[in-house]
Structures are given as C-alpha cells and as structure tokens.
C-alpha cells in the first residue's frame, strides 16, 4: 500500500507526504518544534513555491511520527508489519480511502481483539497451561497474517512446548508441506529431541549434529522438524540455504543479536514462510540488539540500522525521550 495524506486546498486534493518529508529532512528538530506547540496552534507547511498551508499542530504531531520512519523514501510503501504504526492515526478526524484490510490489522495488533482460540491438534500429548494456550493462539495469529515475532517467556515457562504445539498444528492442518528448522544452542539439542518425542511423537525429527551429519542431508526433505546448532548453521549454510522451510525458529535468539555476525547473516538469508525467535532476553545491552532481532524476523519493521539509530536509539538512549520510547514499545509490542 502507498501511504498518502491528502488534503483539499481550494477544491484541489494535495498530498502532504512530499512536503512533510522534505521538512523533516531539512529540519531534523522539526518534531521537537511541533511538540512545543499547543494542539490548536498551526504550523506553516509549504506545499510548493506559491502555497503555504497552516496545519493544526495536533494533527502534525500524529502525522510526523510515522513519517520519520520513511525519510529514505519519496513515496512511502506500507506492508503488513507497518499496520501497527497506523493505529494512532485512527484517533484523528481523518477520512480514510482504501487500505481497510491494513487498518483493520493495525487495530487488531493494537489490542489483539478477535484473536482466535486454536485447540492443539489430536496427537499432541501435552496439556497447555492457560498462558501457553494464549501463546499458541498468538503464534497462529502471526502465521495467519504473515507476521513474525519473539516468544520471550522466561526460562522454564514452556517456550519449547508452545512452539511444538504450533508446529504440530501446522503439520496436521496441512499447511506445513515442507520441513521446519529449529536452530538452537548445542546444549538444547537433547531437550528439543526429548520434548518432540514426548509431546509430538508423530512428527519426523531429524537432528543435524555430529561429524556424520552430512550423511543425513538427503533426509531433510522428508523430515517435519530439523534441528541444528548455531555453529553448524554457518558451516552447513550451503545445504540449509538450498532448502525452502515452513517455519524457521531461532532458540536462544540472542545468539543472532549481532547483525554483522555470520550466524545472523545466514539466518536472515534462509528462505522460510514464517519466522519465530525464542529468547528470554531479547534486549541485553542496547537497542541495537532489538533492531537486529527484528531485522531477522521482519526486515523493514524498524527501518534500516542508520534510520533506527536516528529515529529511536539516539533519542531514547542518549536524550531520554519518553515519547520515542513509548512509540518504539507500541511498534514492537504486537510481535513480542
């Protein structure tokens, strides 16, 4: 979808996106200036060389925040993962034209209204606790809309069993017509193997580990679930990159928090319909780690690294801007 902000001036429909983007590029402190105005005050926006439009500061504040993330584009394009960014604009007296599906998704991401309950499929042998059931519903919600996320429950609260319930439901529904890949630390290989055998015994599990693992590469296409480790993800990248996956899961996903590391780059290059990260610590040291997680999951959600630093990281970490902290929280909350 294209993002346009149209107003009528003397009967002519004029797009405010180009002049607002131009203003933001020319005046980096524009948002701060506008924030200092009362909502009822107006701010002059030059539409062209001849026309200046006074825009209410209240509307301008709401419009500028989403546009900050599109400064590198002359014509902003919205994808599904940008839907949450539109939620605040619904509060304005705005007439929307088109994009209803995207706006509806934005509202659902805002409060998760209408999230369907998905019972574990027959053959899944665990009994999910209430919060684990909510986790399964959320994973299915993300899958339904082609989104990705971070399951960030604390250690011991069942991230593995929730993921297995999701994988099993995908397989029994017929949606998983290709294998899924879990990348985890070496210490977690046995846990994944044992819990899969206990809770999803009808899933075909293939462990790619050990010196003889290359002998089992030919079995990847027949497996439902393939398990490997972060070091082997890099070593076996040629084989793993050649396979199309249904679900790609990064367990202990803090291991790909460095976007320059080979593990992150290989993981980002893998072809998968759906992606999921499991970690109890999505953010350990700085906001750049959070950006790296979402760069793997949904590239573009938080812009490129340079734009993320300009829009979010510097204002939050160095300037202590609570409004941008809130904005970032609202942006990632549906996916975390």
What are these regions (language model features)?
Residues 95-336:
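ASCE P-loop NTPase motor core, strongest for the SF2 helicase catalytic module
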């Amino acid at each position: 979808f294209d993002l346009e902000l149209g107003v009528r001036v003397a009967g002519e429909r004029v797009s405010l996106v180009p002049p607002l983007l131009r203003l933001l590029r020319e005046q980096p402190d524009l948002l701060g200036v506008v924030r200092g105005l009362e909502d009822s005050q107006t701010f002059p926006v030059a539409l062209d060389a001849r026309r200046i439009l006074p825009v209410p500061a209240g509307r301008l504040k709401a419009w500028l925040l989403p546009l900050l993330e599109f400064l590198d584009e002359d014509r902003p394009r919205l994808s599904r993962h940008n839907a949450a960014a539109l939620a605040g604009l619904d509060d304005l007296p705005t007439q929307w034209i088109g994009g209803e599906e995207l706006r509806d998704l934005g509202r659902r991401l805002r409060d998760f209204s209408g999230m369907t309950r998905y019972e574990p499929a027959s053959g899944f042998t665990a009994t999910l606790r209430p919060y684990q059931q909510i986790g399964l519903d959320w994973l299915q919600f993300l899958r339904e809309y082609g989104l990705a996320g971070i399951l960030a429950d604390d250690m011991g609260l069942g991230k593995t069993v929730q993921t297995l319930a999701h994988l099993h439901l995908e397989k029994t529904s017929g949606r998983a017509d290709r294998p899924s890949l879990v990348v985890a630390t070496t210490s977690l290989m046995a846990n994944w193997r044992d819990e899969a055998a206990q809770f999803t015994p009808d899933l075909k599990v293939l462990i790619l580990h050990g010196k003889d693992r290359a002998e089992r590469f030919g079995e990847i296409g027949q497996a439902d679930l393939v398990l490997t480790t972060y070091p082997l993800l890099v070593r076996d990248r040629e084989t793993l990159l050649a396979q199309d996956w249904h679900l790609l899961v990064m367990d202990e996903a803090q291991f790909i928090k460095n976007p320059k590391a080979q593990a992150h780059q290989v993981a980002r290059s893998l072809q998968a319909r759906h992606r999921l990260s499991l970690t109890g610590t999505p953010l350990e040291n700085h906001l750049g780690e959070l950006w790296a997680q979402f760069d793997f999951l949904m590239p573009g959600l938080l812009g490129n690294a340079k734009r993320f630093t300009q829009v979010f990281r510097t204002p939050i970490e160095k300037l202590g801007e609570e409004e941008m902290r809130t904005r970032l929280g609202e942006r990632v909350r549906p996916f975390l």
